[in-house]
């Protein structure tokens, strides 16, 4: 009987150890891993977008690269996590790269994902091989106010309250009205709106407010890797402002789309893929 009790205790202890030490590390995103190549690409979608935004892009590179496609926690139906913030997400992606021993990946980000790509390359300059920023700026708020300075303690509670107070129809209508200003391809409109509608409202409000407070204009001077900056066609009219924002990024190569809006991968696909191919293969 004594021997039996000892065996039971040993079994329970082993089970406890397996439960504690066998748990996978948590990251503020879901990952879909595809492709099979020695070199890797990490795709970071934009605000409230699904990793599916990269589906067509991935197809062009999966034969030669291992692709890691993220969807951030709380966006597009992915389970939210407590305390979302731009800095936490940046560090989470960097930790994922280190923990999985992904050697010098190419990091491609759209919109807020482009901001994250800049921040990762700036704060972890030895971690990435190249970055591609798809229609993002170092400081979104400075586009309308060049003297903008980010707040050290940024209170996002009002924005969160505003977003969570909307009913389903109000939120859907808001997204339906906003999206045509960001996406010219009507065939993709409902899909992109649906990603927003499926997003967690608290995360939506918190990250909208937090990202608008981000200022990377000085930090990007730390970036050492080659950097391709793809911008929507309208931004050519604001080129002096764009150049000023990016003046500290010495490795930047700027390309302006010929047509379309913020979702360049949908609105000027052939041009977009050509730029990616040329940059990645160089």
Give the label of every model feature segment:
Residues 1-28, 282:
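Bacterial Sec-dependent N-terminal signal peptides
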Residues 33-79:
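Conserved HGGG/HGGXW glycine-rich cap/lid loop of the alpha/beta-hydrolase fold
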Residues 68-108, 112:
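Active-site loop/oxyanion-hole signature of alpha/beta-hydrolase fold enzymes
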Residues 103-143:
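Conserved hydrolase catalytic core segment
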Residues 131-166:
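Flexible "cap/lid" loop of the alpha/beta hydrolase fold
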Residues 226-261, 266:
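Conserved loop-alpha-helix segment in the C-terminal half of the alpha/beta-hydrolase fold
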Residues 266-280:
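Post-His helix in hydrolase/transferase enzymes
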